[in-house]
Amino acid sequence: MIINTAAYQFVTIQDPQTLADGVRAQAEQHALKGSVLVAEEGINLFLAGAAEQIGAFYAWLQADARFAQMRIKYSESAHQPFARLKVKIKPEIISFRRDDASPLQGRAPSVTPAVLREWLRNGQDDRGRPLVLLDTRNAQEVAYGTFQGALTLPIDKFTDLPGALEPHRGALADATVVSFCTGGIRCEKAALWMQADGMDNVLQLEGGILGYFEEVGGEGYEGRCFVFDERVALDPELKPLVDADRTA
């Protein structure tokens, strides 16, 4: 059994190279595969391996005070979904190219999966405001599934989101907007940018779609959640669409 993990942390990294070297050494020591992005704004990880080795790696990482509160999302597969280990240093751990959307300067308010499920059941938030779920993912990902009635945008990359959202601004003015993505990292930046751009009615879904699946299942969601590895997509029970032996 392979344990698949997704995790990120926005935190100031003074020396990304030193962190990247340490992560690479530990991941190799524990025979993990996947991808890790390190930047001055934090770290973004997708790693898979044996349960004991995954546990040892994250115990090492979270012993660092910068990552002690990092939330790790887990799922299982019969086979390793990554071909190799890649650790890279980038300008951002998720490219958005907006100076007005830095999670190092603050965090937009969030809504938990349990609360969002109740809002979806009621068709409104706790104050009686209409609800709009904003999918911040690419069209390729949305094709595999999204929340029922979500506002989806015809974008190919995250940096396209501000322009694609502009025609919808008026329709969102009187609603509570919940931005969501796969694991939380994109909707965190998107919600911050929307706040900075004058929208004071924006929340982010805590933990993203995968966190929602993990905590409350698939209620209100149609289809699967696309992931960027050989599993292709996960259903609300976090089971992969593809679970094949790469070596066969």
From Swiss-Prot:
Keyword tRNA processing: yes
Similarity annotation: Belongs to the TrhO family.
Purpose: Catalyzes oxygen-dependent 5-hydroxyuridine (ho5U) modification at position 34 in tRNAs.
Residue positions of the active site: C181 (cysteine persulfide intermediate)
Catalysed reactions, semicolon-separated: uridine(34) in tRNA + AH2 + O2 = 5-hydroxyuridine(34) in tRNA + A + H2O
MF terms (GO), sorted A to Z: oxidoreductase activity, acting on paired donors, with incorporation or reduction of molecular oxygen
Lineage, opening ranks: Bacteria, Pseudomonadati, Pseudomonadota, Gammaproteobacteria, Lysobacterales
Top enzyme category: oxidoreductase
GO biological-process terms attached to the record: tRNA modification
InterPro entries (alphabetical): Rhodanese-like_dom, Rhodanese-like_dom_sf, TrhO, TRHO_N
Protein name per its UniProtKB record: tRNA uridine(34) hydroxylase
Rhodanese domain boundaries: 127-221
Tagged with keyword DNA-binding: no
E.C. number: 1.14.-.-
